Protein backbone atom coordinates (compact mmCIF):
# COMPACT_ATOMS: atom_id res chain seq x y z
CA UNK A 1 0.00 0.00 0.00
CA UNK A 2 1.24 3.46 -0.81
CA UNK A 3 -0.07 6.79 0.43
CA UNK A 4 0.97 10.38 -0.10
CA UNK A 5 2.58 12.10 2.87
CA UNK A 6 2.76 15.85 2.42
CA UNK A 7 5.66 17.47 4.29
CA UNK A 8 6.10 21.21 4.73
CA UNK A 9 9.37 22.60 6.05
CA UNK A 10 9.17 25.48 8.50
CA UNK A 11 10.78 28.74 7.37
CA UNK A 12 13.85 28.14 9.56
CA UNK A 13 14.41 24.58 8.25
CA UNK A 14 14.70 25.09 4.50
CA UNK A 15 18.34 23.89 4.58
CA UNK A 16 17.53 20.59 6.33
CA UNK A 17 16.75 17.41 4.39
CA UNK A 18 13.28 15.93 4.26
CA UNK A 19 12.72 12.86 6.45
CA UNK A 20 14.26 9.85 4.74
CA UNK A 21 14.42 6.07 4.98
CA UNK A 22 18.03 4.98 5.55
CA UNK A 23 17.65 1.45 4.16
CA UNK A 24 15.40 -0.48 1.78
CA UNK A 25 13.64 -2.30 4.63
CA UNK A 26 13.47 0.57 7.14
CA UNK A 27 10.08 1.02 8.82
CA UNK A 28 10.89 4.50 10.09
CA UNK A 29 12.19 7.59 8.36
CA UNK A 30 14.75 9.70 10.18
CA UNK A 31 13.86 13.14 11.53
CA UNK A 32 16.43 15.90 11.92
CA UNK A 33 17.08 18.36 14.75
CA UNK A 34 16.08 21.88 13.74
CA UNK A 35 18.08 23.72 16.39
CA UNK A 36 19.60 27.14 15.69
CA UNK A 37 22.64 26.43 17.85
CA UNK A 38 24.06 23.25 19.30
CA UNK A 39 22.02 22.07 22.29
CA UNK A 40 23.77 20.53 25.30
CA UNK A 41 21.57 17.98 27.06
CA UNK A 42 22.81 17.29 30.58
CA UNK A 43 22.19 13.93 32.29
CA UNK A 44 18.54 13.79 33.40
CA UNK A 45 17.65 16.91 31.41
CA UNK A 46 14.57 17.16 29.19
CA UNK A 47 14.36 19.51 26.21
CA UNK A 48 11.89 20.12 23.41
CA UNK A 49 13.69 19.73 20.07
CA UNK A 50 11.95 20.99 16.91
CA UNK A 51 12.19 19.00 13.67
CA UNK A 52 11.36 21.79 11.24
CA UNK A 53 8.57 19.84 9.56
CA UNK A 54 4.79 19.81 9.47
CA UNK A 55 2.92 16.92 7.88
CA UNK A 56 -0.44 16.15 6.32
CA UNK A 57 -1.52 12.55 6.75
CA UNK A 58 -4.53 10.99 5.04
CA UNK A 59 -7.54 10.25 7.28
CA UNK A 60 -7.20 7.03 9.30
CA UNK A 61 -3.41 7.26 9.47
CA UNK A 62 -1.06 8.35 12.24
CA UNK A 63 2.63 9.02 12.54
CA UNK A 64 4.45 7.45 15.47
CA UNK A 65 7.57 9.26 16.64
CA UNK A 66 10.14 6.88 18.08
CA UNK A 67 13.68 7.05 19.45
CA UNK A 68 16.69 6.03 17.38
CA UNK A 69 18.22 2.89 18.86
CA UNK A 70 21.82 4.00 18.33
CA UNK A 71 21.31 7.21 20.32
CA UNK A 72 19.61 5.27 23.11
CA UNK A 73 22.29 2.57 23.33
CA UNK A 74 25.36 4.76 22.91
CA UNK A 75 24.31 7.97 24.67
CA UNK A 76 21.15 7.30 26.70
CA UNK A 77 19.18 9.72 24.50
CA UNK A 78 15.53 8.79 24.07
CA UNK A 79 12.08 10.31 23.76
CA UNK A 80 10.10 10.78 26.94
CA UNK A 81 6.70 9.98 25.45
CA UNK A 82 7.42 7.12 23.16
CA UNK A 83 5.92 6.51 20.81
CA UNK A 84 4.60 10.00 20.32
CA UNK A 85 1.46 10.11 18.21
CA UNK A 86 0.87 12.63 15.43
CA UNK A 87 -2.82 12.63 14.50
CA UNK A 88 -3.99 13.05 10.92
CA UNK A 89 -5.63 16.41 11.70
CA UNK A 90 -2.54 17.97 13.36
CA UNK A 91 -0.76 20.55 11.20
CA UNK A 92 1.76 22.09 13.59
CA UNK A 93 5.50 21.51 13.68
CA UNK A 94 6.55 18.12 14.98
CA UNK A 95 8.61 18.58 18.14
CA UNK A 96 10.36 15.96 20.22
CA UNK A 97 10.46 15.62 24.01
CA UNK A 98 14.06 14.42 24.36
CA UNK A 99 15.64 13.17 27.61
CA UNK A 100 19.22 12.27 28.43
CA UNK A 101 19.18 9.09 30.54
CA UNK A 102 22.94 8.70 30.18
CA UNK A 103 25.73 9.73 32.55
CA UNK A 104 27.39 12.28 30.25
CA UNK A 105 26.23 15.52 28.65
CA UNK A 106 25.28 15.05 24.99
CA UNK A 107 25.42 17.59 22.17
CA UNK A 108 22.56 17.81 19.68
CA UNK A 109 23.62 19.58 16.51
CA UNK A 110 21.58 21.17 13.75
CA UNK A 111 20.67 18.56 11.16
CA UNK A 112 21.49 15.60 13.41
CA UNK A 113 19.23 12.58 12.99
CA UNK A 114 17.39 12.62 16.29
CA UNK A 115 14.28 10.39 15.99
CA UNK A 116 12.33 8.32 13.51
CA UNK A 117 8.79 8.53 12.21
CA UNK A 118 6.70 5.45 11.37
CA UNK A 119 3.40 5.81 9.48
CA UNK A 120 0.58 3.48 10.54
CA UNK A 121 -2.99 2.94 9.47
CA UNK A 122 -5.47 3.15 12.34
CA UNK A 123 -8.86 1.64 13.03
CA UNK A 124 -11.46 3.51 15.08
CA UNK A 125 -13.75 0.87 16.59
CA UNK A 126 -17.35 1.30 17.58
CA UNK A 127 -17.35 1.41 21.39
CA UNK A 128 -19.85 -0.88 23.11
CA UNK A 129 -20.13 -0.95 26.90
CA UNK A 130 -20.30 -4.54 28.15
CA UNK A 131 -21.25 -6.14 31.45
CA UNK A 132 -19.49 -9.41 30.62
CA UNK A 133 -16.40 -10.19 28.52
CA UNK A 134 -15.63 -13.58 26.99
CA UNK A 135 -13.34 -15.82 29.03
CA UNK A 136 -9.88 -16.84 27.82
CA UNK A 137 -7.20 -19.19 29.10
CA UNK A 138 -5.16 -16.17 30.18
CA UNK A 139 -8.20 -14.36 31.60
CA UNK A 140 -6.98 -11.60 33.96
CA UNK A 141 -3.37 -12.78 34.16
CA UNK A 142 -1.23 -9.67 33.90
CA UNK A 143 2.28 -8.61 34.75
CA UNK A 144 4.62 -11.60 34.93
CA UNK A 145 1.84 -14.17 34.64
CA UNK A 146 3.88 -16.31 32.23
CA UNK A 147 7.05 -16.11 34.34
CA UNK A 148 10.02 -13.82 34.38
Curated annotation (Swiss-Prot):
Enzyme class: hydrolase
Keyword Hydrolase attached: yes
EC numbers on record: 3.6.1.23
InterPro entries: dUTPase, dUTPase-like, dUTPase-like_sf, dUTPase_trimeric
Cofactor names: Mg(2+)
Reactions mediated catalytically: dUTP + H2O = dUMP + diphosphate + H(+)
GO terms, molecular function: dUTP diphosphatase activity; magnesium ion binding
Gene3D superfamilies: 2.70.40.10
Any one Gene Ontology BP term: dUTP catabolic process
UniProt keyword annotations, A-Z: Hydrolase, Magnesium, Metal-binding, Nucleotide metabolism
Protein's UniProt keywords contain Hydrolase: yes
Ligand binding (substrate): 68-70, 81, 85-87, 95
Pathway stated in the Swiss-Prot or TrEMBL entry: Pyrimidine metabolism; dUMP biosynthesis; dUMP from dCTP (dUTP route): step 2/2
Entry's family note: Belongs to the dUTPase family.
Role of this protein: This enzyme is involved in nucleotide metabolism: it produces dUMP, the immediate precursor of thymidine nucleotides and it decreases the intracellular concentration of dUTP so that uracil cannot be incorporated into DNA.
Protein name: Deoxyuridine 5'-triphosphate nucleotidohydrolase
Organism expressing this protein natively: Thermoanaerobacter pseudethanolicus (strain ATCC 33223 / 39E)
